[in-house]
UniProtKB/Swiss-Prot annotation:
GO terms for molecular function: 11-O-demethyl-17-O-deacetylvindoline O-methyltransferase activity; O-methyltransferase activity; protein homodimerization activity. Homodimer. The lineage of its organism: Eukaryota, Viridiplantae, Streptophyta, Embryophyta, Tracheophyta. 16-O-methyltransferase involved in the biosynthesis of vindoline. Highly specific for 16-hydroxytabersonine. No activity with tabersonine, 3-hydroxytyramine, 4-hydroxytyramine, 5-hydroxytryptamine (5HT), 2,3-dihydro-3-hydroxytabersonine, lochnericine, hoerhammericine, 16-hydroxy-2,3-dihydro-3-hydroxytabersonine, 16-hydroxylochnericine, 16-hydroxyhoerhammericine, quercetin, kaempferol and caffeic acid as substrates. The keyword Methyltransferase applies. S-adenosyl-L-methionine binds at residues 198-201, 222-223, 242-243, 256. It catalyses: 16-hydroxytabersonine + S-adenosyl-L-methionine = 16-methoxytabersonine + S-adenosyl-L-homocysteine + H(+). This is Tabersonine 16-O-methyltransferase. GO terms for cellular component: cytoplasm. InterPro entries: COMT-like, O_MeTrfase_dom, Plant_O-MeTrfase_dimerisation, SAM-dependent_MTases_sf, WH-like_DNA-bd_sf, WH_DNA-bd_sf. GO terms for biological process: alkaloid biosynthetic process; methylation.
Length: 355
């Protein structure tokens, strides 16, 4: 290849950009841990570099203060803050962008947990073990297990910081989904008398649905240690159990970000359990998950979906699925039909499945 050609320069640019992409993620995580988005927001107007540095709590060490500019420059160049240099001023002014606003602690739908989880050293070690996982013949079913000697859930149960990052991410996501469901997708719950939210955790989504549909009995179905200390109130009940064995009967079963954690064989088992739990007439399963390539023209979306698919492989030996793969699962589990509502949010779709 001619080293002076545009083709070579373009190839160089792509390799350098991708090889350095982790630096952006690490810098964003650093900004979140230092409280930079919240500090800018608390200032109430564009903030100078020195004002920002002096306002950080806990403070940065005085010897490191001169280097905050380097971090802010990376954030600004990647759209996580705006940087403005006014005429006659020696310092730039920084403001939040839409991307950094959804990292604020006060924002109910914040994505802080996603940033902290994806850039967690625990996760990075799993990715570092991916090539070993491909090459080895040990009994580890995931790259995460190759790295840590335990599966994702087992490790999280023993390491609270990792679990807290993940739980924060899931709680914020449930807030987002709740808002979408009781808004644009409210029609899904009309006419239902009962619903079971599988893996519903502390019941964020079930409570939101129950509040807007008082006649609807909502059951949060999760593992015993998850629901052990949760109190059932009004039309929200917490029930312990195993979705592979038996699911409580209801008009509808709700699965948010559950099936992408499991391989095809296990997904069919889960779906068969769901089918047994709903009536043959009028029953349905509501799934929130990715449908890969739902919009092939959106390159940013496709790249994010394929990255998430790799994350499912690394952590769970599972996957994201295209419509054809979803249809296969539904048929294998004995369902007659389904309907996809694309683009529930940036990456996911909503699927109704009928017995």
């Amino acid at each position: 290849m001619d080293v002076q050609s545009e083709e070579f320069r373009g190839a160089q640019a792509q390799i350098w950009s991708q090889s350095c992409s982790f630096i952006t993620s690490a810098s964003l995580k650093c900004a979140v841990k230092l409280g930079i988005p919240d500090t800018i927001d608390n200032h109430g107007k564009p903030i100078t570099l020195s004002e920002l540095t002096n306002a950080l709590v806990p403070p940065v060490h005085p010897s490191k203060a001169p280097f905050i500019y380097r971090l802010m420059r990376v954030l600004a160049k990647n759209g996580f803050c705006s940087e403005e240099q006014l005429d006659g001023e020696t310092e730039p002014l920084y403001s939040l962008t839409p991307s950094s606003r959804i990292l604020l602690k006060k924002e109910p739908l914040n994505l802080r947990g996603i940033v902290l989880t994806m850039a967690d050293p625990v996760q990075l070690k799993a990715w570092e073990s991916l090539s070993d996982w491909y090459q080895n013949e040990d009994d580890s079913s995931t790259a995460f297990e190759t790295a840590h000697g335990k599966n994702f859930w087992g490790y999280s149960s023993e390491h609270m910081e990792h679990a807290e990052f993940f739980n924060e991410a899931m709680a914020s996501d449930s807030q987002l989904i709740s808002k979408l469901l009781i808004g644009e997708y409210k029609f899904l719950f009309e006419g239902l008398a009962s619903l079971v939210d599988i893996g519903g955790g502390t019941g964020t989504i079930a409570k939101a649905i129950a509040k807007n549909f008082p006649q609807l009995k909502c059951t949060v179905f999760d593992l015993p240690h998850v629901v052990a200390n949760l109190e059932s109130k009004e039309n929200v009940e917490f029930v312990a159990g195993d979705m592979f064995e038996k699911i409580p009967s209801a008009n509808a079963i709700f699965l948010k970000w559950i099936l992408h954690d499991w391989n095809d064989e296990d997904c069919v088992k889960i779906l068969k359990s769901c089918k047994k739990a709903i009536p043959a007439k009028g029953g349905k399963v509501i799934i929130i998950d990715m449908v890969m390539y739902s919009d092939k023209k959106d390159d940013h979306l496709v790249k994010t979906q394929t990255s998430m698919d790799m994350a499912m492989l690394v952590n769970f030996a599972a996957k994201e699925r295209c419509e054809k793969e979803w249809a296969f699962l539904f048929k294998e589990a004995g369902f007659s039909d389904y309907k996809i509502y694309p683009k529930l949010d940036f990456t996911r779709s909503l699927i109704e499945v009928y017995p």
